[in-house]
A protein has these predicted regions:
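Ubiquitin-like/PB1-type beta-grasp interaction modules and other compact soluble beta-rich domains
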Residues: 1-71
């Protein structure tokens, strides 16, 4: 049995479970996203990239990750 406590969040419109204590930087790491190529909206507000490691996710948070893609 898995004793690690988890919380539910909404990520890009889909429900996900993550470990308690994860911050935005941790979330990007497990999703294998480059911090320099994304913007994160948390509960309707754009999160400050400089504070990703200080913004901890809470139960029922709504997270939207937008990835920048270059083109021509």
């Amino acid at each position: 049995m898995n004793n690690l406590k988890k919380i539910k969040i909404q990520l890009n419109g889909k429900k996900h479970q993550i470990k308690i204590g994860y911050n935005l930087k941790d979330l990007l790491k497990i999703l294998k996203k480059d911090n320099n190529k994304v913007a994160i909206e948390l509960n309707g507000e754009i999160a400050d990239k400089k504070k990703y490691n200080k913004i901890f996710l809470k139960k029922n948070d709504k997270v939207e990750i937008v990835q920048f893609i270059g083109g021509g």
